[in-house]
Amino acid sequence: MREIVSVHLQTGQCGNQVGSAFWQTISGEHGLDSSGVYGGTSDQQLDRLNVYFNEASNNKYVPRAVLVDLEPGTMDAVRSGPFGQLFRPDNFVFGQSGAGNNWAKGHYTEGAELVDQVLDVVRREAENCECLQGFQITHSLGGGTGSGMGTLLISKIREEFPDRMMATFSVVPSPKVSDTVVEPYNATLSMHQLVENSDKTFCIDNEALYDICMRTLKLSNPSYGDLNHLVSAVMSGVSTSLRFPGQLNSDLRKLAVNMVPFPRLHFFMVGFAPLTSPGAHSFRAVTVPELTQQMMDPKNMMAASDFRNGRYLTCSTIFRGKVAMKEVEDQMRTVQNKNSAYFVEWIPNNIQTACALSPPRGLKISSTFVGNSTAIQEIFRRVGEQFSAMFRRQAFLHWYTSEGMDEMEFTEAESNMNDLVSEYQQYQDASADDGEEYEEDAPMEE
């Protein structure tokens, strides 16, 4: 049985580093070594390997990944890294000039020159698929390439493959850790695109990752490698049901149908368990209640917004390893009953659970959490405030206008983001009996 295919795009420095960590993780789970040769032990590993990998000759598997950047540095780092031999050499597409943290360069000038080259590679990968399911993109929203060129690619791919799913793993700017001054501009302009063109966006944020590393994993000085390791654990968890036989959410579209009640509200927060410091997990057995409690703990969410400030529209949990389905179902029911204030009551059964038999490497059981909560508006609100403060004074605007952008675009992006925040707020405040107010206008029965 031929399975579905995901073309994986990595744009910019952040996207490539996170993406490479992801490929490293899933290669290990499928029993592939650093050059893509299969040496695994179980048939399950091979069963749906073709979702993410193409089979080359002599038992070698190649990731269906396209690596994109506007400067060669990141590519060289990936190539010379431990898994550099895994990727197809033709799938590295890079410019020479860099985007200089400027969204306009990534979207309109430098990125636009490179985009056709990238689309050729994407087209070639898509044509080799028997039944293309969709695209998965890793990028950051704060820089120039991942945000500007990433969103350009998303809209171009949308034009060409309008009926395919588009999932993005987006690293959103964090409240205290800022890499560039113009982050709010880049992020707002990107959000403007993602709201329209992405089907689901998993929001990840560096500060939340730092907090997890320091608070839970007890690392005193976390490196980007540690952060990427966390993200790749979540990405691997989210894609488990695509890669291993299971019952629920077995493709991108099914997950989206279960998770997105209104098309614009497709920004998810993610969590993972068990998170223990590297030496500690051998000292205790992990139980399903513990996993559930940990993955739904606000401290372990990988986006800096606290779900207790909003309500869940929907959420999905993926358990991996030998867990009893009944135990999982009971546990999730308990969670929903205890925390009913944090779930909207007008979507019944809004928790989905999926189980897959194969655990991640080094763990007996694990769980991943994906939540569509109205609290995610905190992120947009925060970025929006920073955006307004700078835009009111027209600070740094010349960098964008000199690349041919119009102030109008900034205004549109700002109002689109404000609309998004108020939509989240509206559904947070809605209750099950709100429908009655419309019935006054109904004609009287004779």
Curated annotation (Swiss-Prot):
The lineage's top-level taxon is: Eukaryota
What is the name of this protein? Tubulin beta-1 chain
Its quaternary structure? Dimer of alpha and beta chains. A typical microtubule is a hollow water-filled tube with an outer diameter of 25 nm and an inner diameter of 15 nM. Alpha-beta heterodimers associate head-to-tail to form protofilaments running lengthwise along the microtubule wall with the beta-tubulin subunit facing the microtubule plus end conferring a structural polarity. Microtubules usually have 13 protofilaments but different protofilament numbers can be found in some organisms and specialized cells.
Instruction: Give an example GO cellular component term for this record.
Output: cytoplasm
UniProt record, GO biological process: microtubule-based process
Organism name:
Hypocrea rufa
Q: Which of this chain's residues are annotated to bind Mg(2+)?
A: 71
Acidic residues composition bias: residue spans: 431-446
